[in-house]
A protein has these predicted regions:
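Sec-dependent N-terminal signal peptides
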Residues: 4-12
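Bacterial Sec-dependent signal peptides at the C-terminal "C-region" and cleavage site
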Residues: 12-24
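Flexible, non-catalytic peripheral segments of proteins
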Residues: 22-149
């Protein structure tokens, strides 16, 4: 019985890591399809074979420029500013939660057409890949971005 329990624990411990490795390989594969060229003013020009590739590159470049703003916009739209800024932001959170219901947003994502899901996935993946390639960046709250957010 102890051997079976030990085996189950090993399998359980390995599964998320395999999923994470698969996700990282997916990001790396998509990143290879994107070219970001910054001009003399630092403006990113993003090239990719598909719209999703360009969206992935856009979010990666935006995070390079100002990850803080990307994260704060997400936190605000999710009605979670008080978790970062404290009690003074409770009213802002309550107001946002009146307009945006995470359960409804997840449902809308699931019901979206495939072409739109690819864009939303690329949007989140570009941010997540940025965080993966820049471990020195410490998010205020969100360590993973989902496409429905």
């Amino acid at each position: 019985m102890k051997k079976l329990l030990f085996l189950l624990l090993i399998v359980a411990a390995c599964t998320p890591q395999n999923d994470q490795q698969k996700e990282i390989k997916g990001w790396e594969k998509q990143a290879q399809k994107v070219t970001i060229i910054r001009d003399n003013f630092g403006v990113p020009h993003i090239y990719g074979k598909t719209d999703a590739d360009v969206v992935f590159g856009l979010m990666y470049a935006q995070c390079e420029d100002d990850f803080n703003r990307v994260e704060v916009n997400y936190i605000n739209s999710m009605g979670r500013m008080a978790e970062v800024q404290g009690e003074s932001s409770l009213f802002i959170d309550l107001r946002m939660q009146m307009y945006i219901d995470p359960v409804e947003v997840k449902k809308e994502y699931e019901q979206s057409p495939e072409w739109l899901k690819r864009l939303m996935d690329a949007y989140a993946d570009g941010i997540n890949y940025f965080l993966y390639t820049h471990p020195e960046v410490k998010p205020k709250l969100l360590t993973r971005f989902d496409p429905w957010m």
